[in-house]
């Protein structure tokens, strides 16, 4: 997503088109419901690893979408706005840190 966004932003900027992306983390949806139970290894991993300590709610994406669609982002292009509760900040760290 990051490289595609950057490449497209570079190519389309001359046409006054901004290209940005939203990088979602792990969200509570009907598809993730079967694994969002206490004791499920992946659920426990997400809860432990995400600094926010929870799965995201789909409504958490609204702010990012509104910002990128607004005049406030007129000079923003080639960026991915990660809405992930901070999980990317933990990549490469031991799980107990």
Language model feature labels by segment:
Residues 5-6, 62-65, 69, 74-88:
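Short-chain dehydrogenase/reductase
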Residues 26-49, 90-97:
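A glycine/serine/threonine-rich, flexible loop-to-helix segment
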Residues 38, 53, 70-73, 92:
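Generic structural signal for alpha-helix termini and adjacent loop/cap motifs
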